[in-house]
């Protein structure tokens, strides 16, 4: 943050287990500009603000803890490691572990795991409970939560959202996603944020009909295939760069309980040039309608598009824990760079 070294307590504003005015009218009003956007060196996308349920399975199983701190049972395995094989047999979920261990006659097994893109083998002792055998590790193979889709890119035919990584709530590690899906809500509920507690979005989602899927999970969000009709109700908007961002008035987009996309006024109060941070844009909610509705920025709003001077410039990522009216966002350029994984 320019000229300041302030230590603040922050919360990533997406939930993992792990609204008033409609769009402002200053959009690109037709597709003619989109046809010429390459020649004009401009990029156009559909800003969304669509709240979605998120479910994903991990690549292998994630180690989130130990039954006991005993080197015999954990070896060199660390929290946040991804187990991908036992005795050279590939595993994809927790059930695979149980099935493999049923056929093991030895007291030890070889665990193959990945850590920081490296493949590592560790031999550990099994725990025995009568005839049952199991690892002395706590593991997870799936996550679920709520987040917001930032935009749909018609050139790349992908969505991008959340603005920060989906992380494991126990290890705080970025999750390696094998397959993820997004779902539209059947019902949305709000737990309002206060200075004493962070609010959050929750609800029921239509899990029978995913509106998109993804495999890419990066420090700057997720990206994948998008099947929702939501983009048809919006218009193309120019993507702004860091140099287009100014201090002062802007607004964010977010769905309300009736699935209408609504704009809410904010102020941009500071801008950082740290390219590795997800706290590049400091924002403050000034719209009484949003403050009365949610208390300000709450979990599940991560990914809400930030718009200024008719350009999509960023996405909301964090809330300040003891002041829900204030938070942070990321430059939209960081999300544009995300590549989809087939």
Protein language model annotation of sequence segments:
Residues 71-82, 103-105, 296-300, 305:
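A short glycine-leucine-enriched loop at secondary-structure breakpoints
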Residues 85-118, 323-334:
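PDZ domains, with a preference for the canonical peptide-binding region formed by the helix
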Residues 48-78:
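PDZ/PDZ-like groove recognition
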